[in-house]
């Protein structure tokens, strides 16, 4: 495997790093080679882990071992059902351990559509449980999944602003959170913020935000979709109880188990009593023609229907593997990698990096977003893919308000003399960024290749721009090179091959 960020720790840390190397190197797809516009084949560099991570080999191995025993849960009468039920329950316990949740006070349950499904469940449930509190406080940094559900179920959603560092926006402004709590005293149901921005990777001070929320009688909800794979989480048992988190929501596909469900971890009393938002099989004690009795048992009452058993077991395997490594070790490694990436990109004046880059003041994890000045983000992403086989993401990353604010801020700093209306119009036209995001398998060499590719794009801008046409949808399409996806893989041919061999 390629060289990773260096470490000076010894002893138990050496063992942890050995496990890290083994687990990281097992990720499926690291050696994938694909044709590029030059006619060569090149190994893919996967820098899109914030969107979805690659599956770890250990997860695939666990699923392969489990699959012969597969059966539905909700029964222990036959061996397969008994085994599936036991391991499905173990996956719940592993979730609680991984986020540092008190097992006596907290429950974990799985939901179908990732963090989005989890946040919708949280908002719908708490709007019923807290009828006198019709305000939710969040921030402008949020992914739509930690914004729109609150808008749907609550009368008012307040979007707290970020701090401003020496160069750009930083983390959520604690003073803005406090002002919003004071202005809506007695009405705030909960504060819900992302632990780590899916755009900039900036880490928010969730413990301090929790203390503010609790001081005003509000709950603290953390969108951990991006945090879960990069930063240690301690939900319960903090030295200061005010720092404890009431609800954590995340997605399994963000933590090396694609195909696994979303997860809600919450204080039990918040989901006890009443009728759950989703009803069906498995969440009732009894049903008559004119009524039904929901079970009081958690997590069963929040998991109507047949669960994603295989996905949950895969998630449990991923969490246990990372638990064996230690999230502190992983965070240390990834911090070094982020510092390396920021250093290389910051050295290029033609690159605009979004969010304040002072990692001492505003630590980051997992992702950074940028643009080549004067080049459309879609073109930059297309060139990185077509000529270098570097997989990045572009556009607004389901965080339109945040991206709009940062693009406008950058344009205002570089384009003197524009009126407010002209600036707004230009920002809308250029709204979007390129995002490079890292996983446990990202190496120093991957970062170096990205930096070299960007340097080449800057040096040969005219050449690259001449190779592309703009499509009616605003995408950039190479004039001569076409990636034939069906030649690489398609479901029909894969089935036909199996059937005829």
Language-model segments: which ranges?
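Pyridoxal 5′-phosphate
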Residues: 1-501
